[in-house]
């Protein structure tokens, strides 16, 4: 029963991180800060929710699958976000979001 409440708490923390990342994504002015907000959602919010769901799950097999998925997201998502940021720097995309819109339409 205690594990159930720990799982609920982890899901609430993960949802708070997702919600704050969504607010940051829409409020931040430029591409690189929006990239940071999106990485917070994917790198912290989703895995914490998955670990919370693993605590709530009744079956041990499903719990292990959820924990493995959370570990993969913890490891792979920062690498993908770094690659996206480095590629945008390589293409000399400025932080101004109007430049990105013009490069996409070309």
Swiss-Prot record:
Name the source organism.
Answer: Rickettsia conorii (strain ATCC VR-613 / Malish 7)
| MF-aspect GO terms | sodium:proton antiporter activity
Query: Pfam families per the record?
Result: PhaG_MnhG_YufB (PF03334)
What taxonomic classification does the UniProt entry list for its organism? Bacteria, Pseudomonadati, Pseudomonadota, Alphaproteobacteria, Rickettsiales
- Protein name per the record: UPF0091 protein RC0354
Q: Which NCBIfam families match?
A: CPA3_mnhG_phaG, PRK12674.2-1
What protein family does this chain belong to?
Answer: Belongs to the UPF0091 family.
């Amino acid at each position: 029963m205690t594990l159930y409440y720990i799982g609920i708490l982890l899901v609430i923390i993960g949802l708070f991180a997702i919600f704050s990342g969504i607010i940051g994504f829409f409020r931040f002015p430029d591409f690189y800060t929006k990239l940071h907000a999106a990485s917070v959602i994917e790198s912290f919010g989703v895995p914490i929710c998955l670990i919370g769901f693993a605590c709530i799950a009744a079956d041990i097999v499903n719990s292990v699958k959820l924990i493995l998925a959370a570990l993969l997201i913890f490891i792979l998502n920062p690498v993908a976000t770094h690659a996206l940021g480095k590629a945008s720097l390589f293409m000399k995309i400025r932080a101004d979001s109007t430049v990105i819109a013009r490069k996409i339409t070309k």
